[in-house]
């Protein structure tokens, strides 16, 4: 059937195998090339050769989860009753805790029975949500650049994807991207047939770190209500706002529940990446449609994880502030350090990433070539902008997943290898 050629670990994706086969897997074979695997392969090769590669590519949180979550998980796992199948939509107390969190932080009232469902991480929730919202031949609008699953999810559902290059959104030096964003959005909706059914957004934005206010969210809601569209807001960085900025929930906008759903995850806010605890909240019809689909696909998360997540949201509500402060320190260390070696980048006000244009002396390289050069010459792994869609070409992404001392070492490595800077 095939020959196993090489093992590679994906960047933010499950472990991947490069495997040659004569069999036809249409849904898989039609996916775009996964460019992160190139950098991962070089990183693995360098580490096997003994290099100390500083990984600022994969957005995998390194901050320990709350101790209360760990303790409650261990306690709940001792009870055999918790070893059985659970509810695919999550325990009632878990959904009630999520509702309380939204009320407390954003003043949004949610019905735990109808407007909240637990998902096994936001990627699982988003991917299956696309199955609910889109059929073959439907269209979805996705800004470019975007988080890769926002691109792949509609394709898995068989939909047509309209990646809208957002030139101002992509450039961190442009602070006001709103006019360009809505002009591009309107054009994407008006051109072609069928009319798009779904808009996918995420703010604070991955990969660019761009942020928006509630006025922007209201315009998104109004845009979608006028066109009978559903807007899906991936709120992965809900608790990561810097320099006085606080990210708004799209559900704070007037009329949002008529057309909007939002994904909230404990991955970044509570540094619980491997726990896979997230929620879809908002429009009851959409939420309940996902509940029905999930009832055929899974039996929910391991119940001790649900119990631990419930207790954590209720009893450690300030933990996200501690996490945010750590990422802010790392952001400042990275950007201040880069400025000292001649690479000036504006400080993003949100997310756990820093998005940067390729420095002028290296503009002859595309983003994959530049990141490959960085791994080979600097022992630093970054993410090429092309991996986030065509609108990301010419840029690279730093993930703030090393401590400040390691970031400082990374800066020294970059100074050594990027000889054209200065």
Where are these regions (language model features)?
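Conserved AMP-binding/adenylate-forming core of the ANL superfamily
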Residues: 94-98, 121
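Short beta-strand to alpha-helix junction loop
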Residues: 89-90
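Glycine-rich loop-to-alpha-helix module at the N-terminal edge of alpha/beta enzyme cores
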Residues: 56, 79-85, 97-104
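PLP-dependent class I/II
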Residues: 4-24, 29-34, 39-54, 59-76, ...
């Amino acid at each position: 059937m095939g020959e196993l050629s090489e093992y590679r670990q994906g960047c933010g994706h499950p472990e991947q195998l490069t495997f040659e086969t004569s069999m036809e897997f249409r849904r898989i074979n039609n996916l775009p090339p996964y460019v992160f695997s190139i950098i991962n392969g070089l990183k693995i090769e360098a580490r096997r050769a003994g290099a100390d590669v500083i990984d600022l590519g994969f957005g995998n949180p390194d901050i320990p989860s709350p101790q209360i979550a760990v303790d409650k998980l261990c306690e709940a796992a001792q009870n055999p009753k918790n070893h059985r199948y659970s509810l695919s939509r999550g325990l009632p107390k878990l959904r009630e805790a999520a509702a309380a969190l939204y009320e407390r932080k954003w003043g949004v009232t949610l019905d735990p029975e109808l407007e909240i469902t637990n998902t096994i991480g936001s990627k699982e929730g988003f991917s299956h949500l696309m199955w609910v919202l889109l059929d073959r031949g439907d269209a979805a609008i996705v800004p470019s650049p975007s988080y890769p699953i926002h691109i792949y999810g509609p394709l898995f559902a068989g939909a047509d994807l309209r990646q809208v290059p957002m030139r101002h959104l992509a450039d961190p030096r442009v602070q006001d991207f709103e006019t360009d964003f809505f002009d591009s959005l309107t054009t994407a909706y008006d051109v072609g047939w069928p009319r798009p059914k779904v808009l996918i957004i995420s703010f604070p934005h991955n990969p660019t770190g761009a942020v928006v206010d509630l006025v922007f969210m209201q315009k998104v809601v109004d845009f979608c209500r006028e066109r009978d569209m559903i807007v899906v807001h991936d709120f992965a960085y809900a608790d990561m706002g810097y320099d006085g900025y606080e990210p708004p929930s799209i559900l704070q906008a007037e009329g949002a529940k008529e057309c909007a759903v939002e994904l909230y995850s404990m991955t970044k806010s509570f540094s619980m990446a491997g726990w896979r605890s997230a929620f879809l909240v908002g429009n009851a019809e959409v939420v309940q449609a996902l509940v029905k689909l999930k009832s055929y696909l899974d039996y929910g998360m391991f119940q001790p994880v649900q119990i631990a997540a419930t207790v954590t949201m209720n009893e450690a509500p300030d933990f996200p502030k501690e996490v945010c402060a750590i990422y802010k320190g790392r952001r400042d260390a990275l950007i201040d350090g880069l400025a000292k070696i001649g690479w000036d980048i504006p400080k993003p006000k949100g997310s756990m990433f820093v998005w940067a244009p390729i420095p002028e002396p290296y503009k002859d390289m595309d983003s994959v070539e530049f990141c490959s050069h960085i791994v080979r010459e600097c022992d630093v792994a970054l993410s090429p902008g092309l991996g986030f869609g065509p609108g990301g070409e010419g840029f690279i992404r730093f993930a703030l997943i090393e401590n400040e001392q390691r970031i400082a070492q990374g800066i020294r490595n970059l100074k050594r290898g990027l000889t054209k800077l200065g």
